[in-house]
Amino acid sequence: MNKFIVFEGIDGCGKTTQAKLIAEKLNAKFTFEPTDGKIGKSIREILSGSQCQKETLALLFAADRVEHVFNIEEDLKKSHVVSDRYVYSSIIYQISQGISKDFIYTINDYAKTPDLVVLLDVDLNEALKRMESREKEIFEKIEIQKKIKEGYYNLINSEDKKFMPKYGFIIVNTTSKSIHQVFDEILNAIIDKIPDIIQ
């Protein structure tokens, strides 16, 4: 049976690079949030500096995810699916903005629970160096990234079982490691959790 794997972590941790490499290794469909659909494009405009109420942005993310989940379900009929960000990003980032967890959970009730979540950790200063060449989004400030990092660990260590992945979480620290080293570490950890994932 095909698996749904999600990559999460703060900005600059190496999620996109590693998610693409793992997707390629597993012959999986690579996908991401926000998506490149109409709603996802609106979200990207807001993240780049357009003004919007935080609850409106949360609802847009949830709406984009409804479309995303439909596509994920279709793709899972044919192959594994690897996503760069998913509902956990919404939970962490939106709670950091002061939105209630109950509100976030309610509007994301439609979200499919993944089989496995890979959380990439990184030293904050190294993450900022990696992001220097990028256009800054509203969440890419060191104080916010520190809060986001704490949020991920709080979520993993909480008693809350909502959206708890079937095979749990894998945590890999990417600080001072090469792309190849991180890839090997992630792949070995995935195989440990799901031995039959590579046929």
From Swiss-Prot:
Reactions listed under catalytic activity: dTMP + ATP = dTDP + ADP
GO CC, any one term: cytoplasm
Name of the protein this chain belongs to: Probable thymidylate kinase
InterPro entries from the UniProt entry: P-loop_NTPase (IPR027417), Thymidylate_kin-like_dom (IPR039430), Thymidylate_kinase (IPR018094)
Keywords: ATP-binding, Kinase, Nucleotide biosynthesis, Nucleotide-binding, Transferase
GO MF: ATP binding; dTMP kinase activity
Family membership: Belongs to the thymidylate kinase family.
Pfam families attached to this UniProt entry: Thymidylate_kin (PF02223)
E.C. number(s) listed in UniProt: 2.7.4.9
Residues binding ATP: 9-16
Top enzyme class: transferase
One of the GO BP terms on file: dUDP biosynthetic process
